[in-house]
Design a protein with these regions (language model features):
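N-terminal Rossmann-like NAD(P)+-binding subdomain of aldehyde/semialdehyde dehydrogenases
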Residues: 9-116
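Structural signal for hydrophobic packing residues in well-ordered secondary-structure cores
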Residues: 36, 51-54, 58, 69, ...
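Hydrophobic packing residues within well-ordered alpha-helices of enzyme cores
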Residues: 164-167, 193, 213, 277, ...
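N-terminal amphipathic/basic-hydrophobic helices that include classical n-h-c signal peptides
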Residues: 1-11, 374-389, 393-394
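ALDH superfamily catalytic-core signature
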Residues: 15, 208-343, 361-367, 371, ...
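Conserved C-terminal structural/oligomerization subdomain of aldehyde/semialdehyde dehydrogenase
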Residues: 38-39, 333-382, 396, 401-508
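Rossmann-like NAD(P) dinucleotide-binding subdomain of oxidoreductase/dehydrogenase enzymes
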Residues: 108-244
């Protein structure tokens, strides 16, 4: 058993049997066909039940997050529990408006018809979530499924077994299995779930696993929402307020110890402010977490040994200029800045999902300074005392200015889930206009997800579909176009043999 108990729980957690998966899937389909979930009063009642359950189980959820992730109560509440309860309250207030049949304009050629847009639930849905925000990323989509009128199967991650078990118990106490149920287990359980014919699959995870989900969904033409990740760039221009940038970036990168799908992944920084930023970043990490970050209860650990080994493995891809301390027993990794990184190294091609930050320096002319080539022998990662020989590193040039180099760099890679720019707001809008990402911030990081009034989602390799607020309701709904035509008059021009075609052609 590890310090947080994860290994023991993974060995003893019972996988949901295939027979039970099939049975519950069929029961939920039959329950949906009964029409009970369609009633707006039923949906509101179920949302209120979920809200009451969240409030009742809050302390158990927070304790479980501490056990699995070393996530403090404050961070658990702010980044997980309160986001779900806030979403529930928002849906209770607005689902009546969202679900209402809406009148649409009818052109003259449809006279005497009335046109409507009608929302209907997609049906029986599957929601699969990852381990990094195991409460928020499983239950937030569920809110949309309930408000839309769907039945749902929830599949939490086996890597956070304590949280997954608490959620299973909470859902079982709150809802009937024929309405909402939780399935537990490993990839074999996932495979059995994906074999079923769902009316929609909502998946949060990696792009690699998303391809498996899409392949399974394609067999039945099942629609999907994919909330993925990627390498979200953080640009620091020379006009940036370095003190503010360092504080916000340090917070965003250490939140959940960098295990956030929209965490800033790598830094593209103007050479004139690079040294000042490194010093300010180090100071802000100390301000946030104290002189000995290992003693800070707000600093989250890596989810398991595999994640710890993967993230610390990135240290060899460059030279550490800040941080670098680790503790394998507790899976602690200090916030770490690394420079002289090969642009084709794993550190610059894989989503980091940890508190390690590659720093790429660019000058006024758009020259990327000193990126090591992957074929050269890597320097030993021993803090800032290690510097590569000049023969090992060579500058790369991108024509034009700093901003043009940034744009070229970002657009040459997969579209990220988030994009962050620090500098003049006008320049930020220019860079955003010429790049593509799921969302982003100017002079901030991560906070775009905190506004429940705007949708959240990826683009390209970082995902498809949107949720949060009305977008969650829309994600689990089908939009129908309905025309109701009066019978008191029947205009003849649409009927064969089109005797009025000349007149109709002039009108149309």
């Amino acid at each position: 058993m590890t310090i947080f108990g994860t290994s023991l729980f993974i060995m003893t957690m019972e996988n949901t049997s295939t027979d039970k998966i099939i049975s519950i899937h069929q029961a939920q389909k039959e329950y949906f066909r009964s029409g009970e979930t369609l009633c707006l009063c039923f949906r509101k009642k179920m949302l209120k039940k979920l809200l009451e359950a969240m409030e009742k189980w809050e302390s158990k959820l927070a304790d479980a997050l501490w056990t699995d992730l070393h996530k403090s109560y404050e961070e658990a509440y702010l980044t997980e529990i309160s986001i779900v309860t806030g979403e529930i309250r928002n849906h209770i207030r607005n689902v009546g408006k969202w679900a209402r049949r809406k009148r649409a304009h009818s052109p003259l050629k449809l006279f005497p018809s009335r046109s409507y847009v009608v929302k209907e639930p997609l049906g029986n849905v599957l929601i699969v979530s990852p381990w990094n925000y195991p409460v928020q990323l499983l239950l937030n989509p569920l809110v949309g499924a309930i408000s839309a009128g769907c039945t749902a199967v929830l599949k939490p991650s086996p890597y956070v077994p304590t949280v997954s078990k608490v959620i299973e118990d909470m859902i079982a106490e709150t809802f009937e299995e024929r309405y909402i149920a939780v399935m537990q287990g490993n990839r074999h359980v996932n495979a059995a779930l994906f074999e079923q014919r769902w009316d929609m699959i909502f998946f949060t995870g990696s792009p690699a696993l998303a391809k498996t989900v899409m392949e399974a969904a394609a067999k039945n033409l099942t629609p999907v929402v994919l909330e993925l990740g990627g390498k979200s760039p953080c640009i620091i221009d020379k006009a940036a307020d370095i003190a503010v940038a360092a504080k916000r970036i340090a917070w965003g990168k250490t939140l959940n110890s960098g295990q956030t799908c929209i965490a800033p992944d790598y830094i593209l920084i103007h050479k004139d402010v690079k040294e000042a930023f490194v010093k300010a970043f180090a100071a802000e990490v100390r301000n946030l977490h104290g002189e000995d970050i290992r003693k800070d209860r707000h600093y989250v650990r890596m989810v398991n040994d595999k994640a710890f080994e993967r993230v610390t493995g990135y240290f060899k891809d460059g030279n550490i200029i800040y941080g670098g301390r680790t503790d394998a027993e507790s899976r602690f990794i200090e916030p770490t800045l690394i420079e002289n990184v090969a642009l084709d190294s794993p550190l610059m091609t894989e989503e980091i999902f940890g508190p390690v930050f590659p720093v790429i320096t660019i000058d006024d002319n758009g020259t990327i300074l000193s990126p090591c080539h992957s074929e050269s022998s890597p320097c030993h990662p021993e803090f800032s005392q290690c510097h590569p020989e000049p023969s090992q590193c060579h500058p790369e040039r991108s024509e034009g200015s700093f901003l043009q180099s940034v744009i070229t760099f970002v657009t040459s890679r997969e579209k990220p889930l988030a994009f962050y720019y620090f500098g003049k707001e006008s320049d930020g809008w220019d860079v955003i206009r010429r790049t593509s990402s799921g969302g982003g911030c100017i002079n901030d990081v991560i906070m775009h997800i905190a506004n429940e009034n705007v949708p959240f989602g990826g683009v390209g390799n970082s995902g498809m579909g949107r949720y949060h607020d009305k977008a969650s309701f829309e994600a689990f709904s089908h939009t129908r176009s309905i025309i109701a035509t009066g019978t008191w008059i029947d205009l003849p021009f649409r009927y064969m043999p089109y005797k009025m075609f000349v007149l109709v052609k002039k009108i149309l």
